[in-house]
């Protein structure tokens, strides 16, 4: 099993997004969401990764970044690490600066994306956001983004995952 920046449970995800949108008011809505989840998914609504990993005998490789603003590290990785850090089936890889969407990208990509983002912000300011269109965004990307640099994978992580799976089938 390879997990990349994943939530422990669907209710954790709902609560986290709800807290971003509604603040502490989500606490009053959570019982409703729990009931909706149970009505829609039955017994599956209460499943979570932590308990599933505990029952599994599979080897597990878990990636997460401390600065993930979509899925806070304490809602998954930290829980798994606390429970399984001493279990030889588990391998943990924690990053500090890869966010949620860039776990697989090299450090060069992160730097390049920051540069492109700064250029894009400047481009938007020059045009004026009121007049900005989707076509302009597409044109900017075509003219200014080197897709090979923008999407380059971290070869060490890819190698680590392949080796992990190779070791599992031996």
Regions found by a protein language model. Name each.
Residues 58, 72-83, 107-108:
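Short alpha-helix in the alpha/beta-hydrolase fold that links the catalytic acid
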Residues 55-57, 62-68:
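Short beta-strand/loop motif that positions the catalytic acidic residue
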Residues 2, 61-63, 93:
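Hydrophobic/aromatic beta-strand patches that form the interior of the parallel beta-sheet core
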Residues 35-52, 58:
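Active-site nucleophile elbow and catalytic-triad environment of alpha/beta-hydrolase enzymes
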Residues 81, 86-170:
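C-terminal catalytic histidine-bearing segment of alpha/beta-hydrolase fold enzymes
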Residues 54-56, 85-86:
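Short, conserved loop/helix-junction motifs that constitute active-site signature segments
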Residues 66-71, 99-102:
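Acidic catalytic loop of the alpha/beta-hydrolase fold
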Residues 1-42:
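Hydrolase active-site cap/lid region
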């Amino acid at each position: 099993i390879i997990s990349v920046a994943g939530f422990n449970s669907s209710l954790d995800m709902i609560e986290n997004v709800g807290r971003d949108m509604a603040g502490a008011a989500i606490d009053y809505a959570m019982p409703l969401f729990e009931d909706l989840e149970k009505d829609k998914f039955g017994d599956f609504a209460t499943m979570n990764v932590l308990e599933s990993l505990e029952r599994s005998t599979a080897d597990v490789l878990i990636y997460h970044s401390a600065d993930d603003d979509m899925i806070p590290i304490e809602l998954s990785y930290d829980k798994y690490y606390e429970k399984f850090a001493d279990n030889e089936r588990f391998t943990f890889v924690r990053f500090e600066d890869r966010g949620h969407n860039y776990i697989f990208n090299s450090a060069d990509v992160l730097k390049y994306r920051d540069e492109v983002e700064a250029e894009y912000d400047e481009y938007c300011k020059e045009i004026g956001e009121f007049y900005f269109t989707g076509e302009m965004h597409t044109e900017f990307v075509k003219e200014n983004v080197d897709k090979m640099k923008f999407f380059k994978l971290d070869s060490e992580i890819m190698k680590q995952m392949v080796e992990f799976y190779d070791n599992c089938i031996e």
